[in-house]
Amino acid sequence: GAGVIGWFAWDMPNPSTVLAQDNRQPAVTIVASDGASLMKVGDLYGLRVSLSDLPPYMPQALLATEDRRFYYHPGVDPIGVIRAIVSNLRAGGVREGGSTLTQQLAKNLFLSRERTLRRKVQEALLAFWLEARYGKDKILEIYLNRIYLGAGAYGVEAAMQRYFGRSAAEANPQQSAMLAGLLTAPSRFAPTTNLQRSQDRA
């Protein structure tokens, strides 16, 4: 009951406090003597975009890749968990994780990379909290602004600027599909690393 939940939750971070903070370090811009921008060094964080700013096929492409049932579960998807278990048993190893988009956001925002039962339960508890606090569209918006998409780019705006030199609001269907294809392995599939492989994933 409550005691079991308390045991799992006692050392969890305060999600409201974490979301209110922004500890992301901006890229450093190297400029020439005449003031012209030469290059950026470090991670790139784009301007925050709202869901309404984006063409609909961008979030659609992401959900088709990451969480097709996003709008039909409360943060944790029992059907996805069962499907992952069956797939892993058939494969004889871990092939699918069963985590929803909300769980991925909870893990990326609040938790360490530690892979234990305790962390998995905390991930689920935080996913339920996010769903209750923000709702689907806001969760998707936060995810789109925070997700790592390779080449030091965090968020769809930064990724669009890094790879295509345009804003996320100007993304076309192919570019949206290419960004969605980066989610599985951002560094491996980044267009800056292997353009053909990235296009094949789109």
Name the predicted role of every residue range.
Residues 1-31, 69, 89:
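N-terminal type II signal-anchor transmembrane helix
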Residues 13-17, 42-51, 64-65, 124-125:
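N-terminal post-signal-peptidase region of extra-cytosolic proteins
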Residues 21-53:
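Short extracytoplasmic
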Residues 22, 50-101, 154-164, 171:
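Flexible, acidic/glycine-enriched loop-and-adjacent beta/alpha segments
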Residues 32-36, 55, 59-60, 131, ...:
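Conserved SET/PR-domain catalytic core that frames the SAM/AdoMet-binding pocket
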Residues 35, 67-68, 145:
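Alpha-to-beta junction loops
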Residues 38-47, 63, 87, 184-187:
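Acidic/histidine-rich, surface-exposed loop or edge segments in extracytoplasmic proteins
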Residues 93-202:
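Non-catalytic, structured segments within soluble enzyme domains
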